[in-house]
Amino acid sequence: MADITDIKTIIYTEKTLGLQEQGVVVIQTSPRVTKNSLKAVLQEYFGVTPVRVNSLRISGKVKRFRGRAGQRDEIKKFYVKLPEGVSLENTEA
């Protein structure tokens, strides 16, 4: 089961700010987090039960640095639809 330390950040871009107007929050996590474990973390720490959770896995790109190949970290993003009138900003953690 995941815990609050597996949630890395809430993503703020032009696209996600538009989604926030519709009640959707985009959360970046470690790849081992599942939909059910994220729902449990949101319920336990924020007191919010999400309406819907969609996930997206992004594999790490291979990048070159000083002539050597390296790889970026793999991440997972969740699109979390919150109940109407609820946001993660106005909840206490």
From Swiss-Prot:
Pfam families: Ribosomal_L23. GO terms for molecular function: rRNA binding; structural constituent of ribosome. It comes from the Bacteria. InterPro entries: Nucleotide-bd_a/b_plait_sf (IPR012677), Ribosomal_uL23-like (IPR013025), Ribosomal_uL23/eL15/eS24_sf (IPR012678). One of its GO terms (cellular component) is ribosome. Transmembrane segments: none annotated. Keywords: Ribonucleoprotein, Ribosomal protein, RNA-binding, rRNA-binding. GO terms for biological process: translation. Gene3D superfamilies: 3.30.70.330. The keyword ATP-binding does not apply. Belongs to the universal ribosomal protein uL23 family. HAMAP family: Ribosomal_uL23_B. Part of the 50S ribosomal subunit. Contacts protein L29, and trigger factor when it is bound to the ribosome. One of the early assembly proteins it binds 23S rRNA. One of the proteins that surrounds the polypeptide exit tunnel on the outside of the ribosome. Forms the main docking site for trigger factor binding to the ribosome. This is Large ribosomal subunit protein uL23. It comes from Campylobacter concisus (strain 13826). The gene is rplW.
